[in-house]
From Swiss-Prot:
Phosphorylated in mitosis. Required for centrosome duplication and formation and function of the mitotic spindle. One of its GO terms (cellular component) is microtubule. Pfam families: NUDE_C. GO terms for biological process: cell division; cell migration; centrosome duplication; centrosome localization; chromosome segregation; establishment of chromosome localization; establishment of mitotic spindle orientation; microtubule nucleation. Belongs to the nudE family. This is Nuclear distribution protein nudE homolog 1-A. Keywords: Cell cycle, Cell division, Centromere, Chromosome, Coiled coil, Cytoplasm, Cytoplasmic vesicle, Cytoskeleton, Kinetochore, Membrane, Microtubule, Mitosis, Phosphoprotein.
Length: 349
């Protein structure tokens, strides 16, 4: 405006034209501003509509998000409750499992200790088993030896019983033949008074051999007659001939006394064996009675001593008694000891 007031016009028309041009200019500016205002209003209405639509959309979305937030919050609360519950349950379960684990470790330690003890006991049992097996084998070996020894001793006892039976039979025959002897003495008194001095000397030697049975008589004068009695058959034949009534020769008598001495020595050895067997069996089975064996041995020895004491009588009876004691049995007596290791006594039995 100051610029306009400072203008100097030359005429009124120039001033009017000037002011007209200025009015036109401002009018054009006003129209442009009005147009811009309308455009701005239209754009503002469009923006407002868009903003309202966006606001509505945002509000709807906000409501959805709020509801979703509420739902998620509720889910979170439920999950928290479930987590707390699960955590408490897990804590209890973990505590229980820890207790079970400690108990299991204690049981495992006890079982390991028990296994070590069982292994040690197993080793001890194996050593004891080996020792027992060795002792059992030793015991079986000793038992087999004892069984063999008992069987051998039982065989000897059976042989001894057979010997006792034969001795009893000989005693019976001796009793019968004594009666016959009494009859023959009445019939043969002249013959009994004609005994030669040589026969008396031989009877004296027979009595000496009876007194010491452990030392058999083997003088030079008897070697020839002893050679004739080496075989059981010849000795048996000579003894059978003794029953025919002819007296025994001095050689036969001395051989018979030697056999009696051998018999006594063998009986003594058998008694020592039976005594050792009795001690062994007493150690194995203390309750087994052995008095019968010792009694029978005693009776056998007494019987043999009685026969020897009878044999030391008169010179006439000695030959007949030797024939009775070492003579042949009847034909029905079995020859069961011909090959026995007991010698001539078994051959007689």
């Amino acid at each position: 405006m100051d610029d306009l007031e400072n203008n100097i016009f030359n005429s009124v028309e120039e001033e009017i034209l000037y002011w007209k041009s200025v009015a036109m200019k401002y009018k054009q500016c006003s129209e442009e501003a009005q147009q811009e205002l309308q455009e701005f209003q239209e754009a503002s209405r469009e923006y407002e509509a868009e903003l309202e639509a966006q606001l509505l959309q945002t509000e709807g979305r906000n409501r959805d998000l709020f509801s979703e937030n509420n739902r998620l919050r509720m889910e979170l609360d439920a999950i928290k409750e479930k987590y707390e519950e699960q955590h408490s349950e897990n804590y209890v379960q973990i505590s229980t499992l820890e207790g079970d684990l400690s108990q299991t470790k204690a049981v495992r330690d006890q079982l390991q200790k028990y296994i070590r003890e069982l292994e040690q006991a197993n080793d001890d049992l194996e050593r004891a088993k080996r020792a027992t097996i060795m002792s059992l084998e030793d015991f079986e070996q000793r038992l087999n030896q004892a069984i063999e020894r008992n069987a051998f001793l039982e065989n000897e006892l059976d042989e001894k019983e057979n010997l006792l039976e034969s001795v009893q039979r000989l005693k019976d025959e001796a009793r019968d033949l004594r009666q016959e002897l009494a009859v023959q003495q009445k019939q043969e008194k002249p013959k009994s008074n004609m005994v030669s001095p040589e026969t008396e000397r031989m009877d004296t030697s027979v009595q000496a051999s009876i007194a010491i049975p452990s030392a058999p008589l083997t003088p030079l004068s008897q070697r020839g007659c002893a050679s004739t009695l080496t075989s059981p058959l010849s000795f048996r034949t000579s003894l059978d001939d003794g029953y025919s009534g002819t007296p025994l020769t001095p050689c036969a008598r001395i051989s018979a006394l030697n056999i009696v001495g051998d018999l006594l020595r063998k009986v003594g050895a058998l008694e020592s064996k039976l005594a050792s067997c009795r001690n062994f069996v007493h150690e194995q089975s203390p309750n087994r009675p052995l008095t019968s064996v010792s009694a029978r041995m005693k009776k056998t020895r007494e019987g043999i001593e009685n026969r020897l004491s009878i044999a030391s009588g008169s010179s006439v009876e000695k030959g007949l008694i030797k024939r009775l004691e070492f003579g042949s049995f009847p034909s029905n007596t079995p020859m069961q000891g011909m090959h026995s290791p007991q010698g001539v006594v078994k051959m007689i039995i």
